[in-house]
């Protein structure tokens, strides 16, 4: 049997009761994860809870890479390390800080400065890549990766205040979405007769019409790959 867990991290912001129960780090509700040590403690508690569920593959959404709000950690890498898994991949929906200039990454992994148009400039000041997106972790080997852009929905203009005051208006742009697929090699006793499984992870838009289009694109791309396939995520 193969166990797949999908989880929206919400950049590991701890909610009420976080860390209670058997987690060694104790109660983390309200913890300030801008501190790297605290951010790692939250990931440690999460790794313990994931371990209790005994999954073989973990599909993650809303994952931070190098963001100040979450201790500037590579959340996917740290979580994979805490789980003792060697196979993982992060795919940025966008590069850049949450509160700054967001941009399309040149390469979704954001593994090196050249993967972001502003990466070389950041490297001059000793700053690594920064982004936000999906990730896939696996206890079993992953022999190939694919990433597909799913686009974004329309921008939204909101008004709070007088209709004749320009300061009353704010423009909110939709978040870019993507599909990350890993080709997972499975032992014979996990799913007899299934040597490989294409596992995809995505996070759809909140607008129904945009989400439907993104889901069609994601599923269509996944089903073109040889072998069985599974799509996980936040729908």
Language-model segments: what does each one mean?
Residues 29-36, 63-65, 150-171, 201-209:
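Surface-exposed cleft-lining segments at the edges of enzyme active sites
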Residues 1-131, 197:
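N-terminal, active-site-proximal structural segment of metallo-dependent hydrolase catalytic domains
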């Amino acid at each position: 049997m193969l166990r797949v867990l999908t989880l929206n991290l919400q950049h590991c912001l701890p909610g009420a009761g976080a860390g209670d129960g058997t987690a060694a780090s104790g109660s983390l509700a309200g913890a300030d994860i801008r501190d790297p040590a605290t951010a790692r403690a939250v990931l440690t508690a999460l790794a313990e809870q994931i371990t209790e569920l005994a999954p073989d593959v973990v599909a993650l959404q809303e994952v931070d890479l190098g963001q100040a709000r979450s201790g500037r950690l590579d959340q996917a890498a740290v979580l994979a390390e805490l789980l003792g898994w060697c196979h993982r991949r992060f795919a940025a929906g966008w590069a850049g800080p949450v509160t700054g200039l967001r941009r399309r990454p040149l390469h979704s992994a954001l593994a090196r400065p050249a993967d972001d148009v502003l990466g070389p400039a950041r490297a001059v000041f000793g700053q690594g890549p920064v982004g936000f997106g999906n990730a896939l972790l696996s206890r079993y080997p992953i022999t190939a990766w694919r990433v597909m852009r799913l686009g974004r929905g329309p921008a939204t203009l909101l008004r709070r205040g007088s209709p004749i005051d320009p300061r009353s208006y704010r423009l909110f742009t939709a978040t870019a979405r993507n599909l990350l697929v890993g080709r997972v090699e499975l032992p014979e006793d996990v799913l007899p007769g299934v040597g490989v499984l294409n596992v995809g992870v995505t996070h759809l838009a909140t607008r129904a019409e945009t989400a439907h289009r993104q889901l069609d694109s994601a599923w269509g791309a996944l089903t073109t790959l040889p072998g069985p396939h599974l799509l996980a995520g936040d729908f």
